[in-house]
Amino acid sequence: MATIINLAGELEKLTMLRGRRPETTEAERKASGGFINMAQFRDGHVFGVKFSGDAAWERHPNGDELVQVVEGSTTLHVMTDSGLQSHALKPGMLAIVPQDTWHRFEAPDGVALITATPMPTDHLMIDIEDPRTLSAAELQGHVEKKRG
């Protein structure tokens, strides 16, 4: 059976999570009212998100993530083999973040996003310039796994 989602209606239910930072936990994100799991999709979920501030570095070991900007603006920072790439995104733009690539969002004035996110997701719970500089042991000590 097809799943039909009223995106505008679902996003309308959200409250802007203000002042998001890399250390914001999964429990804090869920309790904020700024995140909604709209549907299961393949090996992950379709999420609606509203926040201002800086998100944690994250990566998705099992697939690419689709991100669409609906309202506001954000800078998507992607850590590539050649270093940091930053992309200014505004409403109507879609980004495809490659599998297992560290990335984060910076939205000082606020953004509303729809994502198709594969699970699990690794969130790095410390503010660091380049997550690739951490050893495997350091990563284990600072990664919060999100499973849906």
Predicted regions and their residues:
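A short, N-terminal "cap"/entry segment at the start of jelly-roll beta-barrel domains
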Residues: 1-47, 56-57, 138-148
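Short histidine-centered beta-strand/loop micro-motifs
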Residues: 37-40, 56-61, 78-79, 86-88, ...
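Structural motif
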Residues: 45, 66, 73-75, 102, ...
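Short, conserved beta-strand element in jelly-roll/cupin
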Residues: 50-52, 61-80, 116
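Short beta-turn/strand-loop junction motif enriched in small, turn-promoting residues
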Residues: 53-56, 100-102
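Short acidic-glycine-tyrosine-enriched beta hairpin
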Residues: 80-99
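Ligand-binding loop in jelly-roll beta-barrel domains
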Residues: 90, 99-127
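A generic hydrophobic-segment detector
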Residues: 115-148
